[in-house]
């Protein structure tokens, strides 16, 4: 939820964003039902919620973004959270097209990288990953 000093503006903007990002909100609610007992962190500046998911659900430092909700493992570092925040900004921009324009290319790149044993450097040079780093103000040297 994005917050403004004016409460009415906050409500109006968030209703519009809720409708615009419905294709991310619905899967986020399903994930919220699955990943219970999470530690919740709210970044009011970025208007996002970060949920630290129990380690048993993922291997390594897996993270993903569904609109204004970011799911991370406990050992996920701050730069990865910033990267996922960049994807949240992409969600605001692309709205209902987010999964076609961002999620699908991102997942395909991730799977290809794993299958072909490509480096993180290789992965982060492609759009939408490069764009997410830019929007999230990621120090890429700390991620690689």
Regions found by a protein language model. Name each.
Residues 2-41, 50-53, 58-59, 98-144:
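Metalloprotease/metallohydrolase-associated module, dominated by Zn2+-dependent proteases
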Residues 49-76:
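Active-site scaffold of zinc-dependent metalloenzymes
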Residues 74-90:
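Short alpha-helix carrying the canonical HExxH Zn2+-binding catalytic motif
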Residues 85-104:
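Catalytic Zn2+-binding segment of zinc metalloproteases
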């Amino acid at each position: 939820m994005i917050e403004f000093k004016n409460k009415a503006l906050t409500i109006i903007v968030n209703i519009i964003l809720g409708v615009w990002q419905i294709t991310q909100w619905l899967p986020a609610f399903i994930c919220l039902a699955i990943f219970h007992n999470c530690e919740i962190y709210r970044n009011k500046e970025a208007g996002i919620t970060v949920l630290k998911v129990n380690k048993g659900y993922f291997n390594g430092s897996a993270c993903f973004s569904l609109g204004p909700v970011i799911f991370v493992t406990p050992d996920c570092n701050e730069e990865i959270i910033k990267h996922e925040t960049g994807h949240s900004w992409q969600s605001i921009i692309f709205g209902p097209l987010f999964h076609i324009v961002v999620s699908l290319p991102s997942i395909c790149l991730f799977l290809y990288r794993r299958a072909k044993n490509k480096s993180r450097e290789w992965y982060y040079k492609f759009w939408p990953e490069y764009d997410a780093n830019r929007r999230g103000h990621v120090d890429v040297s700390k991620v690689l």
